[in-house]
């Protein structure tokens, strides 16, 4: 909760001379410039290599976000192998590899293998020894290989009312599960009573 009004601060667990240790962000604008300059300096230092690593396409988890794809941490070992690379070599040419991630989706697997192959076709690998030839500098792998949202074409159709209610169906299913035991018990007792009457 933010502090408001000129009232005593509740639960103020401050130590002595706490005023000297208050963290302020008066340098926010300056830090922004510093970060930009640092990025530019690093780009010049490691040129013509890109600043960042190539990241995979992953589908975001949970029902709320799973209609979208985004950049993941790293390619799986299976994706790297399918693209004809080894994990150790892939890391040396600017490809992020995550040994923990598992492939549970064939569509995403195929998209990532294709992404790796496209990256391989466009990348220029210089020998470790010897002078690097003049080459166009790629500032960002993320900008060069962007992650696009897949198009979802849904055709418009007339609303159909077949008289069924999803709410009613769920309520009946829940009720069936809840009272199954007692209903089976009643049916069993009724059958036993019928058998006793026949005797």
Swiss-Prot record:
InterPro entries recorded: Ribosomal_eL13, Ribosomal_eL13_CS
Keyword set, alphabetical order: Cytoplasm, Phosphoprotein, Ribonucleoprotein, Ribosomal protein
UniProt modified residues of type Phosphothreonine: 144, 152
GO biological process, one term: cytoplasmic translation
GO cellular component, one term: cytosolic large ribosomal subunit
Pfam families assigned to the protein according to its UniProt record, in alphabetical order: Ribosomal_L13e (PF01294)
A GO molecular-function annotation: RNA binding
Cell location: Cytoplasm
Disulfide bond sites: none
Subunit structure and binding partners: Component of the large ribosomal subunit (LSU). Mature yeast ribosomes consist of a small (40S) and a large (60S) subunit. The 40S small subunit contains 1 molecule of ribosomal RNA (18S rRNA) and 33 different proteins (encoded by 57 genes). The large 60S subunit contains 3 rRNA molecules (25S, 5.8S and 5S rRNA) and 46 different proteins (encoded by 81 genes).
Protein family (similarity comment): Belongs to the eukaryotic ribosomal protein eL13 family.
Additional notes on this entry: Present with 54200 molecules/cell in log phase SD medium. There are 2 genes for eL13 in yeast.
Role description: Component of the ribosome, a large ribonucleoprotein complex responsible for the synthesis of proteins in the cell. The small ribosomal subunit (SSU) binds messenger RNAs (mRNAs) and translates the encoded message by selecting cognate aminoacyl-transfer RNA (tRNA) molecules. The large subunit (LSU) contains the ribosomal catalytic site termed the peptidyl transferase center (PTC), which catalyzes the formation of peptide bonds, thereby polymerizing the amino acids delivered by tRNAs into a polypeptide chain.
Protein name: Large ribosomal subunit protein eL13B
Origin organism lineage: Eukaryota, Fungi, Dikarya, Ascomycota, Saccharomycotina
Name of the encoding gene: RPL13B
């Amino acid at each position: 909760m933010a502090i408001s009004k000129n009232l005593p601060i509740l639960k103020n667990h401050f130590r002595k001379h706490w005023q000297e240790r208050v963290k302020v962000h008066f340098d926010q604008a300056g830090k922004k410039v510093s970060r930009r300059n640092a990025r530019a300096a690093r780009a010049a230092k490691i040129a013509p290599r890109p600043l960042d690593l190539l990241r995979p396409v992953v589908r975001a988890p949970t029902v709320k976000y799973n209609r979208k794809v985004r950049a993941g941490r790293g390619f799986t070992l299976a994706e790297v192998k399918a693209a004809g690379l080894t994990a150790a070599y892939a890391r040396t040419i600017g490809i992020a590899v995550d040994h923990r991630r598992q492939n549970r989706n064939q569509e995403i697997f195929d998209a990532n293998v294709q992404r790796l192959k496209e990256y391989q076709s466009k990348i220029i690998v210089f020998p470790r020894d010897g002078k690097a030839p003049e080459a166009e500098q790629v500032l960002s792998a993320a900008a060069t290989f962007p992650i696009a949202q897949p198009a979802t074409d849904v055709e418009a159709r007339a609303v159909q009312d077949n008289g069924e209610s999803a709410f009613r169906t769920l309520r009946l299913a829940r009720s069936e599960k809840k009272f199954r035991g007692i209903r089976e018990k009643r049916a069993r007792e009724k059958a036993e009573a019928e058998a006793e009457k026949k005797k």
